[in-house]
A protein has these predicted regions:
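Bacterial Sec-dependent N-terminal signal peptides
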Residues: 1-23
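Short, glycine/serine-rich, charged loops/turns that create anion-binding
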Residues: 12, 42-45, 122, 152
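Short, conserved loop/helix-junction motifs that constitute active-site signature segments
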Residues: 110, 136-142, 165-167
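Short, glycine-/small-residue-rich phosphate/pyrophosphate-handling segment
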Residues: 146-167
């Protein structure tokens, strides 16, 4: 029994030290680049945790912007999606089936940036249609586009290839 407790103690100490924060200074690989972090995110009712005021993609976008000193830009449709989860899902499905391009509220001169992080939730195995609206407004030649996607287990679902085709 003592041997097992000793082994468990060592494993716990090793596990804790594995999570210790690295205090070495970070090299900013984006220091000479102008970075945009554009994202679409959903708030409102979430069937797992109730109502949320900030979506997962928004949270990740803020983290990326903080690490890269990038400009944060939220892609927002003119007509907001309903807060109620099922209603939002139904609208998103219809938009995808119709290849809709919902109008977005604002725009940003993406052409002025060298690196664009583009974030979106995976909706029906695709990007939300408002993201396509944003993509199709800009010239992506010579830009480095880095997608990031939030999902509930369906991974990127090939959206990185769709993004490559769209850009």
């Amino acid at each position: 029994m003592k041997k097992i407790l000793s082994i468990l103690t060592v494993l716990c100490i090793c596990g804790i030290s594995a999570f210790a924060q690295n205090t070495a200074p970070k090299e900013n690989i984006m220091k000479d680049k102008k970075v945009l972090v554009a994202f679409f995110s959903r708030t409102g009712e979430n069937y797992n945790v109730g109502n949320i005021s900030k979506g997962n993609t928004h949270i990740i976008a803020e983290m990326i912007a903080g690490e890269t000193n990038g400009k944060l830009f939220q892609i927002e449709p003119v007509k907001p999606y309903p807060d109620e989860y099922r209603a939002c899902v139904d609208i998103a499905k219809t938009e995808k089936e119709n290849k809709a391009r919902p109008a977005v509220k604002e725009d940003i001169a993406a052409e002025d940036y060298d690196v664009i992080f583009l974030g979106y939730p995976n909706w029906w195995g695709d990007m939300p249609m408002a993201v396509y609206t944003f993509i199709e407004k800009h010239d992506w030649n010579g830009k480095t586009v880095i997608p990031f996607c939030t999902h509930e287990g369906s991974e990127l679902s090939g959206t990185e290839r769709l993004l490559e085709q769209a850009c």
